[in-house]
Amino acid sequence: MSAQTPKPNVVIIMTDQQRADLCGREGFPMAVTPFADSLALSNVWFDKAYTVAPASMPARCSMFTGRYPTATHVRTNHNTLDMYYKKDMLEVFKEQGYKTALVGKNHAHVKGKDFDYCEEYFHWGKNQRDTQEDKDFAFFLNNKARGQYLEATPFPAEAQNPVKMVTKALAWAEQQKDSAFFMWVSMPEPHNPYQSLISQCFLRKRYRQL
């Protein structure tokens, strides 16, 4: 890349525990991922890209380092302290002058403090619960939404993790007028506990019609 060519922004959008065929691009008949589908349909689609591990942490550590779990020594969701590598993707972007951000689920060897901006969410809500709404929603996820919660989530969309995360990610990106950035938007969903504006009982009826 020449000195005159502006550096491209790099955004990784990730979902957690989602089957590859549960999206419109792969022919799934319900519009559950319309925005992701629009990206997939207008860009390159790698239909033979497979994860290196069926567990979260090994796969994420491999994504950041380009190394197999056998090389990183991280083979489970509980041993990132064993992580072995020389340099990861985050360090490379920083060396190239990129601003860096994480919004969402980490679950890798990197730390929140390694990013210029970090808003961490996990399956049970925002890690740093700054507002009463954050606390109330985390209580719901921890105590009422465990297992198979079959009703619509009793919170508006704006209070639920996905919408909050996208809102924060967009706000940060719009502030980066003078710097190229790398941003990792890592959705904890659709991994349970589930959040939905639609009753799961209604969804079951729809699925039976497919």
Regions found by a protein language model. Name each.
Residues Q4-V44, A53, K94:
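Active-site-proximal N-terminal segment of extracellular/periplasmic enzymes that hydrolyze or transfer
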Residues F35, S62, D88, K164, ...:
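Alpha-helical elements of Rossmann-like donor-binding domains used by nucleotide-donor carbohydrate transfer enzymes
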Residues E26-G27, N43-T65, L102-K113, S186-H191:
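Short, solvent-exposed turn/loop segments enriched in Gly/Ser/Thr/Pro and often Arg
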Residues T5-P8, Q17-R25, Q128-V163, A171-L210:
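Active-site-proximal cap/lid insertion segments
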Residues P6-V10, N43-D47, Q96-T100, K177-M183:
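Loop/turn elements at helix/coil->beta-strand transitions in domains of secreted/extracellular proteins
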Residues T65-E158, M165:
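Catalytic-site neighborhoods of secreted/periplasmic enzymes
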Residues A3, G27-V32, S56, L81, ...:
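Glycine-rich, phosphate-binding/catalytic loops in enzymes
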Residues P6, P29-V32, Y50-A55, N79-K86, ...:
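A short beta-strand-to-alpha-helix junction
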